[in-house]
């Protein structure tokens, strides 16, 4: 499955300062669905280059990270249980900024 992953609000610094990633992810365990929980695990293993604790806490994103799936807040679509489809666009934006 192909996805576009976008990181903003400083989260791109955890991914070698690359904001937009076009990725191909194989389905896990020959399943025909991929959930946000699966995607977050893949992102932690394959994209986050440093300080993963700044992006994730446990199996989910840290408080203060806004997640959009096709421009829709993931809280409206089931959060970790959100089912992803080919060519979805997932955006991660940190709402916490130093000052």
From Swiss-Prot:
Covalent link location (Glycyl lysine isopeptide (Gly-Lys) (interchain with K-? in acceptor proteins)): 99
Gene3D superfamilies assigned to the protein according to its UniProt record, in alphabetical order: 3.10.20.30
Compartment annotation: Cytoplasm
Record PTM: C-terminal thiocarboxylation occurs in 2 steps, it is first acyl-adenylated (-COAMP) via the hesA/moeB/thiF part of the MOCS3 homolog, then thiocarboxylated (-COSH) via the rhodanese domain of the MOCS3 homolog.
Spans traversing the lipid bilayer: none
Pathway(s) the chain acts in: tRNA modification; 5-methoxycarbonylmethyl-2-thiouridine-tRNA biosynthesis
Superkingdom, taxonomy of origin: Eukaryota
Keywords, sorted A to Z: Cytoplasm, Isopeptide bond, tRNA processing, Ubl conjugation pathway
HAMAP family: Urm1
Role description: Acts as a sulfur carrier required for 2-thiolation of mcm(5)S(2)U at tRNA wobble positions of cytosolic tRNA(Lys), tRNA(Glu) and tRNA(Gln). Serves as sulfur donor in tRNA 2-thiolation reaction by being thiocarboxylated (-COSH) at its C-terminus by MOCS3. The sulfur is then transferred to tRNA to form 2-thiolation of mcm(5)S(2)U. Also acts as a ubiquitin-like protein (UBL) that is covalently conjugated via an isopeptide bond to lysine residues of target proteins.
Protein name: Ubiquitin-related modifier 1 homolog 2
Organism: Arabidopsis thaliana (Mouse-ear cress)
Organism classification: Eukaryota, Viridiplantae, Streptophyta, Embryophyta, Tracheophyta
Record gene name: URM1-2
């Amino acid at each position: 499955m192909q996805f576009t992953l976008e990181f903003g609000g400083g989260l791109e610094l955890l991914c070698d300062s690359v904001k937009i990633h076009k990725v191909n992810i194989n389905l896990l365990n020959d399943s025909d669905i991929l959930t946000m929980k699966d995607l977050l695990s893949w992102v932690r293993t394959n994209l986050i280059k440093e300080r993963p604790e700044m992006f994730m806490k446990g199996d989910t994103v840290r408080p203060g990270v806004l997640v959009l799936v096709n421009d829709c807040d993931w809280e409206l679509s089931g959060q970790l249980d959100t089912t992803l489809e080919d060519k979805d666009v997932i955006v991660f934006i940190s709402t916490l900024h130093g000052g």
